[in-house]
């Protein structure tokens, strides 16, 4: 079976069945499709770990490694793919027909219902062929376990005026609003939200320095202006370790929310000004503040 340029992107290289077995089903799940595969994902994953898992869980949707997700359209499409999968079959019909043609209907139905009844090699072959077609069955099975009317669906986007036009961002936000998705945007980028945990941007930066934060030029092989300011205070690059999250970010979330009040918080102001509406997400999950 040859690999195809699949429209299906939901994929987790980190998924382990042991995690599924230990799962405590929460009353509400926040499903997030995020632009960055490291910074946003690790931040929200660590944040979720601090919450009462019987009440709420943040699930950051995973995509195929190597997929480009710097475009808001792709971020939104990943969330839409998840919702289509949640409301439909585990394997899309066009993929199901192709895999049945190779293995037989009986074999595939057994694989879907009681996979452990199949020969180990046969099961692995089916799984590998599905992955080639863009279908990570185990991850999809894991995601389908969450299905509450109270669940929240959102995208986390960077304004990034150097890459995304205002018109494209306006269209993305409008689409999300029409679909009932929450749209969390930081201008210029998610790292601005991180910076609010680490310092008082309004008092520590002069007007011209804040303008440079908004423009967010690339200043080295590893950093833009904002990511550099984050790195020199928190001492990490893209991936946030749990130790760094607990030391630098978690204790300062309430402070970051307060500091965000000095900047743009809502649309349309967020399109053109330094700011973030990530505090809306913290309000949705009822993050404890004084």
Please describe what each predicted stretch is.
Residues 1-28, 39-41, 45-64, 87-290:
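C-terminal accessory helical subdomains adjacent to catalytic cores in phosphodiester-
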Residues 30-35:
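Short, hydrophobic/glycine-enriched beta-strand segments
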Residues 68-81, 126:
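Charged, often glycine-rich, active-site loop that binds/positions anionic groups
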């Amino acid at each position: 079976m040859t690999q195809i340029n699949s429209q299906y992107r939901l994929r987790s290289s980190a998924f382990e069945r042991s995690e599924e077995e230990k799962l405590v089903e929460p009353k509400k799940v926040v499903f997030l499709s995020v632009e960055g595969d490291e910074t946003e994902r690790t931040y929200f994953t660590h944040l979720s770990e601090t919450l009462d898992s019987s009440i709420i869980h943040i699930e950051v949707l995973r995509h195929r490694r190597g997929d480009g997700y710097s475009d808001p359209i792709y971020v939104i499409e990943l969330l839409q793919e998840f919702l289509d999968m949640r409301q439909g079959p585990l394997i899309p019909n066009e993929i199901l027909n192709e895999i049945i043609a190779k293995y037989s209907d009986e074999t595939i139905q057994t694989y879907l219902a009681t996979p452990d009844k199949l020969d180990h090699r046969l099961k692995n072959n089916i799984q590998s062929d599905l992955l080639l077609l863009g279908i990570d069955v185990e991850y999809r099975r894991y995601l389908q376990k969450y299905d509450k009317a109270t669940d929240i669906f959102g995208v986390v986007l960077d304004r990034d005026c150097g890459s995304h036009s205002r018109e494209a961002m306006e269209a993305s936000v409008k689409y999300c609003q029409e679909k009932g998705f929450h749209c969390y945007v930081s201008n210029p980028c998610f790292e601005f939200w991180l910076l609010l945990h680490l310092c008082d941007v309004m008092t520590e930066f002069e007007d011209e320095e804040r303008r440079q934060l908004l423009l967010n030029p690339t200043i080295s092989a590893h950093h833009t202006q904002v990511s550099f300011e984050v790195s020199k205070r928190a001492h990490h690059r893209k991936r946030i370790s749990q130790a760094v999250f607990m030391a630098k970010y978690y204790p300062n979330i309430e402070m970051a929310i307060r500091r965000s009040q000095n900047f743009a918080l809502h649309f349309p102001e967020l399109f053109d000004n330094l700011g973030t509406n990530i505090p809306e997400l913290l309000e949705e999950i009822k993050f404890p503040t004084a």
